[in-house]
Amino acid sequence: MKNWIVGMVALVTMVPVMAATPWQKITHPVAGSPQSIGGFANGCVIGAQPLPLESADYQVMRSDQRRYFGHPDLLNFIHRLSAQTHQQQLGTVLIGDMAMPAGGRFSSGHASHQSGLDVDIWLQLPKQRWSQQQLLKPQPIDLVAVDGKRVIPALWQPQIESLIKLAAKDNDVTRIFVNPAIKKQLCLDAGADRQWLHKVRPWFAHRAHMHVRLRCPANSLECVDQDTPPPGDGCGAELESWFQPPPPSAKPGKTLPPPLPPSCQALLDNHFATE
């Protein structure tokens, strides 16, 4: 679990309810050439686009929360992945949170997903399309056993591994966060084709979905990428460390969000000045 303290604020995707943020008051994308700005956990996006809610290959959950916006690169990835999934007859891809219309910090649910390059994709592939009621109030399938050390065999399906593998092999994808037990199962099942596994990173929670992160777009000059994952498949000592008791440490104090990138602060200032 190396460097987990450093990465905690930036990467954890399920966080306690936070105070309301001004970003959720921006109801439409900011006009302009698409630009992802700042980091994944402290940024925004100009020229975001909404993911079309109607598709033969995927369905969008909780559309009433309006978290289905992203940089065009993210939309293109979702279309590619869902088309490949459909072609292989794996099932319908279920799309969870992406970003808000201008990106920025959510009031609840995530610390990242701020620059329009993150998407949550559920690890279930229904053969029958969900009803509108199911999409608005989706029921996740927890794939991980109570002890957190393994997946539940009755729930683990080969299609899930195929979905994760397809995403990991996409050139625009830099990281996929899953529960350590899911990563462990992928390591066991991968066979000789293992190069894609280094993109699949163990992380807290993520028991029913994968969190896919894309690289900074080439023309987004203010976008801040993460360092590339370490070489190798990540199936050795690093993965095993996640199943060890954490070292004792002092109770962490409350932390304030870091200052926004100047361009994101200017975006907020300009938006609310013209209201």
UniProtKB/Swiss-Prot annotation:
Disulfide bonds: 44-264, 187-235, 216-223
Chief localisation class: periplasm
Disordered as annotated region, ranges: 227-262
Subcellular location: Periplasm
Top-level taxonomic group: Bacteria
Example GO molecular function: metalloendopeptidase activity
Binding-site list for Zn(2+) 2: 147
Cellular component, GO, one term: outer membrane-bounded periplasmic space
GO biological process, one term: proteolysis
Matches recorded under Pfam families: Peptidase_M74
Details of cofactor binding: Binds 2 Zn(2+) ions per subunit. Zn(2+) ion 1 is bound in the active site. Zn(2+) ion 2 is bound at the dimer interface by residues from both subunits.
HAMAP family named in the record: MepA
Assembly and binders: Dimer.
Protein name (Swiss-Prot/TrEMBL): Penicillin-insensitive murein endopeptidase
Lineage: Bacteria, Pseudomonadati, Pseudomonadota, Gammaproteobacteria, Enterobacterales
